[in-house]
A protein has these predicted regions:
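Charged, low-complexity, helix/coiled-coil-prone segments
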Residues: 8-21, 44-52, 96-107, 189
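Conserved, structured C-terminal
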Residues: 53-278
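Well-ordered mid-protein domain cores that form the structural environment of catalytic cofactors
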Residues: 22-77
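Acidic, proline/glycine-enriched N-terminal capping motif
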Residues: 1-36, 42, 173
Length: 278
């Protein structure tokens, strides 16, 4: 993941302007999910926003594949605001500890005792080797868990401790099946610069009673409807629908395209997300 820090007298106003969710009144130690949009409503990226304990300081956690694009876009939008935008992605990293034993693991293996008191989508700040670490009760798996942010050197040490303790390493393929079964979107599949949050069914993360980039288009889509929308499909046979497969109506007319498809371990069925015409 990418870690971008925003600070300065206009930090709250600026982040609220580029972020679809509402951060005013959002307390330090809390985490919010939302998106950054272009004026036409297309999604620049989806991200987590952390309100830090120091006033007018925010951490924006963006998708790793979008770091350079996101940072350039955020910098461009910031020119009219009194803020400092710093990309720490080259020096910071993240480890996600997820699953039913996540709390026990961060307590017993890593000694992060305060983590047990965290509610979902909250965080606290700790130290590892005398340097800052963010311990966040968040994740992208549909499971309980924690995401740990700190310097690359610390991340390597923490990773080794977890592996030595018998924690199973999992890659993005595993993560992708879990997020999919949990109904969570992935940028590049269910969200993109040509797919809006409303089309992706994420309107609950767009607070249309405030101003933000892309707000007018999203408000119109919510009021008037959209030409396409994201749906879930259950496959009747054992075939696995893959991304980019066409979705056809009964008469053979293509009405959409698969965005993500897997054999669901939980359901023992083939299922997919698809973007279809309305």
């Amino acid at each position: 993941m990418g870690e971008i820090f925003v600070s300065g007298p206009d930090a709250e106003t600026f982040v609220n302007f580029i972020f679809t969710n509402e951060i005013r009144g959002f307390e330090p130690g809390k985490v919010l999910y939302g998106m950054m949009c272009h004026p036409d409503g297309g999604v620049v990226d989806d991200l987590l926003v952390y309100r830090e304990f120091e006033p007018e300081h925010f951490l924006l956690v963006v998708n790793a594949a979008n770091i350079d694009k996101d940072f350039a876009w955020i910098e461009e939008q910031s020119k009219k605001f009194d803020v400092k935008v710093v990309n720490e992605s080259d020096s910071w990293g993240q480890i996600a500890v997820q699953g039913p034993d996540a709390e026990k693991t961060v307590l017993d293996v890593l000694g992060l005792a305060p983590a047990a008191d965290l509610a979902f989508y909250t965080y606290y700040e700790a130290e590892w080797n005398g340097t800052r670490m963010v311990v966040s009760r968040t994740g992208y798996t549909g499971e309980d868990g924690f995401e740990l942010y700190t310097t690359h050197e610390n991340i390597v040490e923490i990773w080794n401790k977890l592996i030595e303790a018998g924690v199973k390493p999992c890659g993005l393929g595993c993560r992708d099946t879990l997020r999919f079964e949990a109904g969570l979107p992935l940028y590049g599949d269910e969200l993109s610069e040509t797919i809006t949050p409303i089309e992706a069914g994420l309107g609950m993360f767009c607070k249309l009673d405030k101003e933000f980039i892309g707000r007018d288009v999203l408000a119109m889509q919510k009021e008037e409807g959209t030409a396409k929308k994201l749906v879930g499909i259950e496959i009747e046979d054992k075939a696995i629908p893959r991304a980019s497969y066409p979705v056809e109506s009964e008469d053979g007319t293509q009405v959409g395209v698969v965005t993500t498809g897997y054999h669901s371990i939980s359901l023992d069925k083939s299922i997919c997300f698809a973007m279809v015409q309305t």
